[in-house]
Amino acid sequence: MVKLRVLEILEEQGRTKYWLYKQMDLSYQNFNRMVNSETKSIRFENLDALSRILNCPVGELFEQTDELK
């Protein structure tokens, strides 16, 4: 399974999930699903926004896990 590392990146940067939510143009429900890897798809524009806001390459936003959903 592939999951987003957004929460880990925020922690590394000393920022909060709420801070990121305020930067994104999403409803809180959709934002929360996305950062908690509870969604089956992510729009490219959201990946681009995450990459720019968190100042990291898109590839660093993901990690592969052995976990199956």
Q: What feature does the model see in each segment?
A:
Residues 1-16:
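A short, Lys/Arg-rich alpha-helix, primarily the initiator
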Residues 8, 33-34, 62-69:
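Short, charged recognition helix plus adjacent turn
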Residues 15-33:
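Short alpha-helical DNA-recognition segment
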Residues 39-49:
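Short, basic-rich loop-to-helix N-cap that marks the start of a DNA-contacting helix
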